[in-house]
Amino acid sequence: TRPDGHTPPGFNLELTRSVRDAVRTATDDRVLVVAQGSIVDTDQAEWAITDGIADAVEMTRAQLSDAELVAKLRRGEATRIRPCTLSNQRSQVRDNRNPIVSSLGDPFTGHETEDQPVEGTALHPRDVVVVGGGPAGLEAARVAALRGHSVTLYEASDRFGGMMRTAAKGPGWARMDLLADWLVGECRHLGVEL
């Protein structure tokens, strides 16, 4: 099984450092070492490379969570990268039990051949009201704004995120708060009135 939110991100980095040191000595630094093991934050990945722990970093689940991860980094938009929750809900190897490899935080991952929300595609932009600032409401507001609509999001409580905030309190689910914060941040970035 893959490590999930119960295991700290980057849990293999010290082992990787030991392997890299041994490989460097044994091969006169001719073999590259790739770090892996729940590395889902770009800051941690960059640190692993700059600190000499590894020559490269594998970030599969991070890229399932945000297929534009590399492009956003290149554009200087690291704060806009959708975080991986390490939930393992949809990111296991594709088989008959899990026919689509996807991400809990990105409903479009795994459905790349279907229509994707494209920025500014609304033929007739409208005023859209979304009631409820939980995960579904935040995502609906985000996608509507991406498509060019003017969106207002109403939430009865004093905090957006709904049940993601509750889930984040459970063992292994703390990263759900990061996803809720990202959704709120994206809504703000896209001009959604909160």
Protein language model regions, located:
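Flavin-dependent oxidoreductase catalytic cores
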Residues: 1-131, 135, 139-151, 159
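Beta1-alpha1 glycine-rich phosphate/pyrophosphate-binding loop at the start
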Residues: 130-193
